[in-house]
Amino acid sequence: PYTTLFRSFAESETEDKDWINNWKQYFKPFTVDHILIKPTWETVPEEHKDKLLIQIDPGTAFGTGMHETTQLCIRQLEKYVTPDSEVLDVGTGSGILGITALKLGAKHVFGTDLDENAITAVGENLEANGIAPEQFKVVQGNIIDDKTVQDEVKYEYYDIAVANILADVIIMLQKEIPVHIKKNGVFITSGIIDMKEEAVKAAFEANDAFEIVEITHQGEWVSVTARKK
């Protein structure tokens, strides 16, 4: 029985490793407007050499950039990032949104994530993109209810907050985020499936701190951007 147990454990570990590596064959270079996102192990296609390059290896953290919700957020970041932007990236995952903000010229990014793997993934992706680690700080924890994380993030500090998570989490976040962003700062959200759009809109509309400035769609996914009054 011990041999069988060991074999099944070894097979399961091999399957996990196979899964971690197999998805890579589906992650190919792609563009979002003038930005080229590519995995670190692929070369830059000749026809895209003039684009703004972002290289990503998610490792075990979430975020290749291929999902519609990430692309929706990237397009909003393109509109709002300036050279002075301080950016808060909630649920940073691989760091793709924060790194995009920095590549677009943002001054600094602060990321939070529940998954400790995000810290390693962001560090590796910063290196792959030639970005100094001090430009992007990441902490593990929940900004919604962890006072230590909330204090570390700082208050009334950010020009932009971005969260590509899930609609139900966005609904909770819209209560907390206003205390962390400056007046007239924007909160860019996605991860919202179309059937949840009305619930997210209603939550923002019921919050006196925000006014919705834009709602965009891609496929069955939605991005809501709100400005702090």
Q: Model-predicted segments: where are they?
A:
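A short, charged helix-loop
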Residues: 50-58
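Conserved SAM/SAH cofactor-binding pocket of Class I
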Residues: 60, 64-143
